[in-house]
From Swiss-Prot:
Gene Ontology MF, one: structural molecule activity
One GO process term, biological-process aspect: symbiont entry into host cell
KW Lyase (keyword) present: no
Ranges for region RNA binding: 254-260
One GO cellular component term noted in the UniProt record for this chain: host cell cytoplasm
Name of the featured protein: Capsid protein
Start-end of Basic residues biased regions: 215-234, 252-262
Subunit structure: Homodimerizes, then multimerizes.
Sites bearing Phosphoserine, chain numbering: 232, 245
Assigned keywords, A-Z: Capsid protein, Cytoplasmic inwards viral transport, DNA-binding, Host cytoplasm, Host-virus interaction, Microtubular inwards viral transport, Phosphoprotein, RNA-binding, T=4 icosahedral capsid protein, Viral penetration into host nucleus, Virion, Virus entry into host cell
Record family assignment: Belongs to the avihepadnavirus core antigen family.
InterPro entries attached to this UniProt entry: Hepatitis_core, Viral_capsid_core_dom_sf_HBV
């Protein structure tokens, strides 16, 4: 990956959240893009990485949805006077990356106890589920951005996606009154290139290389009395002749008759 593509991939994380499709739509679109490569057993870089994220997102998404459903069902058995655990006592995604997976429950339980030692057991389970679901959602957000990048590179080409991210970020960073109303789309960027490639005529045979032979000078021609005469041809000087006079004689026949006086 060149430096421009690497920079564009890093900029994907700064794009607005609503720019990316929802998880269900994203996975469906990615599978449609990957299906031809799966059938041909392609081992391209973008195919392998996108396939990994499709499997990862599907598993994480189903697990996260299950956590939310269980947490919502526990609300009915939590005592109504229970104070919810403040967000500051819940483990965040950045902290979870530094904690071993087996110790995650222990660290979260210690924080709940520090907030309220006699916290109800149902409320504790609810707090654990909400914390884990949020960690999964933040992990899913990073994964879906990477999945979007890799399967769009398969659809449009890495160079086109890199160019599109650059233009989109420029549009987003430009004040509203100085930019166009609509954000650029990757379809609009790639369409002129596709039309130009499709409309190009193909020629058979080998082309003669230019510059190897001197160019021949074209001879200009003019039309004189219905005849075409080359300008490069030497012209004879016109013989002076008065109107109505006979044709001039040649120099050999130009001699005077003897004078009758002699």
């Amino acid at each position: 990956m060149d430096i421009n593509a690497s920079r564009a991939l890093a900029n994907v994380y700064d794009l607005p959240d609503d720019f990316f499709p929802k998880i269900d739509d994203l996975v469906r679109d990615a599978k449609d893009a990957l299906e031809p490569y799966w059938k041909s057993d392609s081992i391209k870089k973008h195919v392998l990485i996108a396939t990994h994220f499709v499997d990862l997102i599907e598993d994480f998404w189903q697990t996260t949805q299950g956590m939310h459903e269980i947490a919502e069902s526990l609300r009915a058995v939590i005592p109504p006077t229970t104070t919810p655990v403040p967000p500051g006592y819940l483990i965040q995604h950045e902290e979870a990356e530094e904690i071993p997976l087996g110790d995650l429950f222990k660290h979260q339980e210690e924080r709940i106890v520090s907030f309220q030692p006699d916290y109800p057991i149902t409320a504790r389970i609810h707090a654990h589920l909400k914390a884990y679901a949020k960690i999964n959602e933040e992990s899913l957000d990073r994964a879906r951005r990477l999945l979007w990048w890799h399967y769009n590179c398969l659809l449009w080409g890495e160079a086109q996606v890199t160019n599109y991210i650059s233009r989109l970020r420029t549009w987003l960073s430009t004040p509203e009154k100085y930019r166009g109303r609509d954000a650029p789309t990757i379809e609009a960027i790639t369409r002129p290139i596709q039309v130009a490639q499709g409309g190009r005529k193909t020629t058979t045979g080998t082309r003669k290389p230019r510059g190897l032979e001197p160019r021949r000078r074209k001879v200009k021609t003019t039309v004189v009395y219905g005849r075409r005469r080359s300008k490069s041809r030497e012209r004879r000087a016109p013989t002076p002749q008065r109107a109505g006079s006979p044709l001039p004689r040649s120099s050999s026949s130009h001699h005077r008759s003897p004078s009758p006086r002699k």
